[in-house]
Amino acid sequence: DHDHGARWQPLSDAVASGACVSLHNDGSVSPPTPLLNVQTAATRRTRSGAVHDPEQRITLDQALRAHTINAARTLGRDHLVGSIAVGKLADFVGLSDDPYCVDPGELAQTISVLGTWLGGQRINLGTFLAAAGAQDPAPHQHLNETAHARHCC
């Protein structure tokens, strides 16, 4: 309901309090949609189009940091991941556009992931899924097709 949605993730209050705000997906119950998470945090607009408690929006920069360096800090791994710096693991994604040059309300619809790097090495999606033990790759085939259509991997 609307009242529950309005109280959902009071991110602005958390940032104002000095908390290390992080965003993530729980793979077992939600799809891995970091760009949509960032978009929602910056706009408070849900998939249905409703805007819940707009005063709890955070800036695009705060939302991006919440999904990168702050998430790594929450896990105690910010010395290894969460940002690109000498001595870190070089785990990152390449995006089709600069998120700071796109309307935050259109982030997930405008920007796509062009590739993923782990330890500085570009990952081939098919190889990764096979190595991860995907029993039936059919549910993931659209990812590979999208990757090839966008000259990825």
Task: Briefly describe each language-model feature range.
Residues 16-20, 27-153:
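Active-site microenvironment of metallo-dependent hydrolases
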Residues 1-22:
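Phosphate/diphosphate-binding loops
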